[in-house]
C-alpha cells in the first residue's frame, strides 16, 4: 500500500499539471486572438488622434493624407470619426488660404476652390454612411441638416471656382467644380435646400459645364 499511494499521487499530480498546461494554452490563444482582433482598432484610434494633433499643428495636408489612407480600406469607411477628422483637415486648408486672401498675402487661389470641392465630397460621403440603417433597420440621421446648412454657405465657391478655372482655360477643373455644383441638387444631403427648384444658377452652371 505504501508503494501504491505515491504512484497514485504522481498520477494525480501529473493530470493536474496537464490540465493546468491546457488551461494556460487556451488562455494564451484567447489572449492572442483578442490582441489580433483589437490591434487594428487601436492603430486606427491612434492615427485619428495623431491626425487631430497634426491639424492643430498646422499640418492639415498630412492629416488629410492620413485619413484618406485609412479610408482606402473598405473596413474603415463606416467609421464616422475618420470622415469628420478628414473634413476638419480639408476645412483647415480652406480656411488657411481664405485667411491669406483676406490679409492680401500671396497664396494660390486655386487651392481655395480645390479645398471647397473636397469639403463637399467628404460630407456627401459621410452622409451616405449616416443614412445607413442600424441593426433594426432604422435610419437616424445625425449630421444631414447641420452639414447641409454648413455647406450651403460654401456652395457658391463651386460655381465661382468653375468660372475661375474656365477663365484660366483649365477645363477639366472647371468642369469638375461646375459638375459638383450641379450635383448638389440631386444629393440627398441637400434635400432640404431644394436647389432643383430654387437655384436659378443651375442652367448657367450646366451650360458652362458643357462648355468646359
Question: Where in the sequence are the language-model features?
Answer:
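Sec/Tat signal peptide C-region and signal peptidase I cleavage site
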Residues: 38-43
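Leu/Val/Ala/Ile-rich N-terminal alpha-helices, chiefly Sec-type signal peptides and the beginnings
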Residues: 47-50, 54-56
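Sec-dependent N-terminal signal peptides
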Residues: 26-36
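Alpha-solenoid helical-repeat scaffolds
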Residues: 152-212
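Post-signal peptide N-terminal segment of secreted/secretory-pathway proteins
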Residues: 56-173
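Positively charged n-region of N-terminal signal peptides that target proteins for export
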Residues: 2-4, 20-27
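Targeting/processing segments of secretory and organellar proteins
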Residues: 3-6, 12-15
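Residue-level detector of intrinsically disordered/flexible regions characterized by low predicted structural confidence
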Residues: 10-13, 21, 28, 47
Amino acid at each position: 500500500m505504501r508503494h501504491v499511494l505515491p504512484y497514485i499521487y504522481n498520477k494525480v499530480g501529473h493530470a493536474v499539471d496537464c490540465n493546468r498546461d491546457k488551461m494556460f494554452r487556451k488562455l494564451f490563444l484567447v489572449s492572442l486572438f483578442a490582441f489580433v482582433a483589437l490591434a487594428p482598432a487601436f492603430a486606427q484610434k491612434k492615427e485619428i488622434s495623431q491626425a487631430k494633433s497634426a491639424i492643430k499643428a498646422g499640418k492639415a495636408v498630412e492629416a488629410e493624407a492620413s485619413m484618406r489612407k485609412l479610408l482606402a480600406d473598405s473596413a474603415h469607411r463606416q467609421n464616422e470619426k475618420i470622415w469628420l477628422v478628414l473634413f476638419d483637415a480639408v476645412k483647415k486648408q480652406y480656411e488657411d488660404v481664405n485667411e491669406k486672401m483676406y490679409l492680401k498675402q500671396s497664396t494660390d487661389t486655386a487651392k481655395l476652390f480645390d479645398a471647397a470641392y473636397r469639403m463637399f465630397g467628404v460630407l456627401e460621403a459621410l452622409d451616405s454612411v449616416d443614412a445607413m440603417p442600424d441593426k433594426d433597420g432604422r435610419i437616424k440621421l445625425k449630421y444631414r441638416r447641420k452639414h447641409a446648412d454648413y455647406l450651403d454657405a460654401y456652395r457658391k465657391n463651386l460655381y465661382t471656382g468653375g468660372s475661375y478655372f474656365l477663365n484660366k482655360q483649365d477645363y477639366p477643373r472647371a468642369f469638375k467644380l461646375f459638375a459638383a455644383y450641379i450635383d448638389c441638387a440631386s444629393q440627398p444631403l441637400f434635400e432640404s435646400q431644394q436647389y432643383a427648384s430654387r437655384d436659378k444658377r443651375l442652367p448657367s452652371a450646366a451650360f458652362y459645364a458643357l462648355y468646359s
